[in-house]
Amino acid sequence: MPTLTGSKTARTVTLCVLYAAQGMPWGFVTIALLSYLASQGAGLAETAKISSLATLPWTFKVLWGPIIDRFTVRSMGRRRPWIIFSQLAMSATLLAMILIGDLTAEFETLAWMVFLHNCFVSLQDVSSDALAVDVLKDDERGTVNGMMWASSYVGTAIGGAGMGTVIANFGLRPAFCLQAGVLFLILCIPILIRERAGEKLLPWTEGEPKLEPGEEETEDIAGVVKGLYGAFAAWPPFLAALYAYAASLMIGMRVAVMPVFYTQEIGWSDEHYSQVEGGVGSAAGVVGALVGGFLADRLGVKVIVTFGMLGVSAFCVAMGVSEELRANESFQLIFLLGTTFLISLKTVASFALFMRLCTPAVAGTQYTLYMALANLARVSGAAIVASLESDGYRTIFLVMAAAIVFPLFFLYPIRQGQPEVKA
């Protein structure tokens, strides 16, 4: 049986399948489950509560990082034990939802079960990211990151559209069972494939811990914190942290402004906007992820990020200054798809950068902090849009155009001691 460090195919397939497994529960809860509950008479308060409790566990990612870096069954690999545990718990919590009596009436119980389920999904996410940092080689990070990101889109589509079809034809409980079964089948991959040759496949089998050159064991949580401080004391990782935050501000602004702008300002229906942004837009995101990952390995992270950011900025300037383009139906569609494609392109290239800058001993925590800063920036971006509401869309789009290129000031100095980050 191949190992993750010994086989590019094994690590690529494993990471992509794990990312699809993360996307499935998200699509299932936010699309299929909430749509079903709404059709059964659930009000906005009930569906909003479930949605909020599904999102909340993703803020715990910054806590999972130090835990998975510190505690593990090292003889089975550094990340596999956590992935196996979280994937198994994801399946178990879905099956537990079947035991809830009247699913449409017991919202409180269902909401907290959704919360618990997504706690394990977020843990699997952090563990998979840390595994990618550990096993991917420098010359494949961009391509594989693109494939992983695209796989998450596929998982979301399966969990949302696929499970939604199951619910419509067979009911909610069969959908719980089917999704739990799929997640359990995915569990077979991390169970059967070792990280490194010579490690234990399972706790009762033969094997021993294997450390890669430069990899260290962290003794305690204090050691993790110390290691993290040491990692960010270096100039490139610190600049990358500033870049991680700045690069996501505009994304948060876009998420906040697009639905209102398209439905209230230029007259799209809610249904049409949802179909374009959620359907064709998702496809554009998949293509952007695959292309961005492929080109980042060949042309360099900075080239791809710069192209993506300048492209988005140009779209925003055009939408802001030209009322004629703003009223043009073709440009309205091109703007949505083009910005989605370019944002996905630069995002995947950025993931490759963050992974290359991670220190092995605290890789899980360090990478998670980069992601946490990006998530925080999206909240900040939405707040910026709210503060600009009275200034009009021209100002908002011009601020978005500036916000998407500003991070380049943090990106370009990242070179000293990091020759793999190509200019």
Language-model features: locations:
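C-terminal transmembrane helical hairpin of 12-TM major facilitator-type secondary transporters
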Residues: 302-350
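C-terminal ends and interior cores of transmembrane alpha-helices
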Residues: 83-105, 310-327
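Glycine-rich segments within core transmembrane alpha-helices of 12-TM secondary carriers
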Residues: 57-61, 142-161, 167, 371-382
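Juxtamembrane intracellular "pre-TM" segments in multi-pass secondary transporters
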Residues: 1-9, 197-240
